[in-house]
């Protein structure tokens, strides 16, 4: 989004949610900062984990600034709602507004255009958690361990 965008916006969730609310927004803002791109607070909206919320937040953003050309959503579900709103306003994706989500959910592969997203290795992290839990049960030891799991950008048709 950063390479081809000029006017950025973000739809997230409450900061009470550390992973989705805080960390994803922090990551987005740090990428903008590293690329010397300013974003005003009024272009950062907070919604809920639903398509309806993504739709409503995108509607607010576009009414406030019709020239937004790049939108990141904290979840794919919210991004799908935003895409619906953007298309209903007669804008083209990605030509007028490029959109990306996070999560690599199944619906993102089915919509038109297909959603650019970030894939997390949930299966791998689940297996690692199960291994850690099994070790805890079998060894009766609470070994604290932090594992950082990687993610991958999945480029599809919703970005330029």
Which positions does each model-derived feature cover?
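Short beta->alpha junction loops
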Residues: 43-52
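An alpha-beta-alpha
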Residues: 1-35, 145-160
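Flexible loop/turn connectors
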Residues: 59-60, 64-160
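Short, intrinsically disordered, charge-balanced linker/junction segments flanking boundaries
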Residues: 2, 45, 65-68
């Amino acid at each position: 989004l950063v390479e081809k965008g000029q006017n950025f916006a973000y739809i997230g969730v409450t900061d009470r949610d550390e992973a989705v609310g805080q960390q994803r927004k922090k990551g987005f803002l740090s990428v903008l900062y590293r690329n010397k791109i300013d974003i005003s607070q009024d272009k950062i909206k907070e919604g809920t984990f639903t398509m309806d919320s993504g739709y409503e937040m995108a509607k607010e953003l576009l009414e406030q600034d019709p020239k937004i050309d790049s939108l990141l959503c904290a979840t794919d579900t919210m991004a799908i709602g935003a895409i619906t709103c953007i298309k209903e306003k007669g804008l083209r994706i990605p030509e007028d507004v490029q959109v990306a989500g996070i999560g690599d959910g199944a619906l993102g592969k089915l919509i038109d255009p297909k959603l650019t997203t970030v894939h997390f290795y949930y299966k791998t992290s689940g297996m690692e958690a199960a291994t850690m839990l099994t070790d805890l049960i079998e060894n009766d030891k609470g070994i604290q361990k932090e594992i950082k799991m990687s993610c991958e950008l999945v480029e599809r048709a919703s970005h330029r």
